[in-house]
């Protein structure tokens, strides 16, 4: 069975309970490695009044060299160590504060995630599955990242793309955790063309639509529309480029050369993978809209995620594209209000994320 590296997220959240309650069923479809120290795991299990059997846990440690070793088998747990350059000393000796924002839990969750990311990068596992973190806890810990995807960009120096959804509807986010005031400035021909090219090459979806930025997609310039003009130009260029089968070197050159862009467009007569005009966002998520196109790109976070979560909250997952590793995540937050309360916990997104990762081919 394929191996999954699973980072525990914020230990003060529902993540650890999802992990424990799902372990037996998850182990039927993959071999999970949980990135948590035994002492901290035992504290969480005691608070939850749960037990974890036949599991593999990985204690991670900051070191200048990468090294993965089996340590011991104890109380039906297989305990491993993974040393790597983390940039921080790992402190697992802190108290769990259920449902609270805490810098120590924030830093520990980040280091669990970083260690699990490089565990996959070093080919010890097929994919990474991340449990939810709290962005404020990361900030309080002195971390500069706004979330997992932001950190992955820095780890691997790649333009990671966030995609969320399920088989009924997937949405790629052109921008993620940035203020709305900054989104319009980010929408440039160059930025959007690169994004659309990369998004297609990662997904190979056959038909995709861009959600308009302005109400009614600008309504022919009556309600703004400047962003939609840029979107139309980028769509036409990327459709023509993908059809041409030209290489990356040509793409970079054509981004700056309007004559090459015109040449591509003159030679392009077919139907592109992207619909030619931005879609009106307020009807794109209706039954008829999704029947027409259920693979979408949104210029900003809430434009896509509000309707996605209203329609498919329980089964949606988060996928990071355009990286040297496979990374998936649950599509929900820390749910501090339910943490360590034996509340009803929905594990469907967790299983959907695991199954999605298992079914993907390994990154070269």
UniProtKB/Swiss-Prot annotation:
* One GO MF term attached to the UniProt entry: magnesium ion binding
The keyword Zinc is assigned to this record: yes
| Residues binding substrate, per UniProt | 148-149, 309, 318, 327
One Pfam family name is: PdxA
CC terms in the record's Gene Ontology section: cytoplasm
Q: Where does a divalent metal cation bind?
A: 177, 216, 301
Q: Which domain of life is it from?
A: Bacteria
What is an annotated GO biological process for this record, any one? pyridoxine biosynthetic process
UniProt catalytic activity: 4-(phosphooxy)-L-threonine + NAD(+) = 3-amino-2-oxopropyl phosphate + CO2 + NADH
- Pathway the protein contributes to: Cofactor biosynthesis; pyridoxine 5'-phosphate biosynthesis; pyridoxine 5'-phosphate from D-erythrose 4-phosphate: step 4/5
The enzyme's first-digit EC class, named in words, is oxidoreductase
Cofactor(s) this protein requires:
Zn(2+); Mg(2+); Co(2+)
Subcellular location, in the record's words? Answer: Cytoplasm
EC?
A: 1.1.1.262
Keywords for this entry?
A: Cobalt, Cytoplasm, Magnesium, Metal-binding, NAD, NADP, Oxidoreductase, Pyridoxine biosynthesis, Zinc
What job does the chain carry out?
Catalyzes the NAD(P)-dependent oxidation of 4-(phosphooxy)-L-threonine (HTP) into 2-amino-3-oxo-4-(phosphooxy)butyric acid which spontaneously decarboxylates to form 3-amino-2-oxopropyl phosphate (AHAP).
Q: What else is known?
A: The active site is located at the dimer interface.
Which proteins does it associate with, and in what oligomeric form?
Homodimer.
User: Would you identify the family this protein belongs to, as annotated?
Assistant: Belongs to the PdxA family.
Q: What is this protein called?
A: 4-hydroxythreonine-4-phosphate dehydrogenase
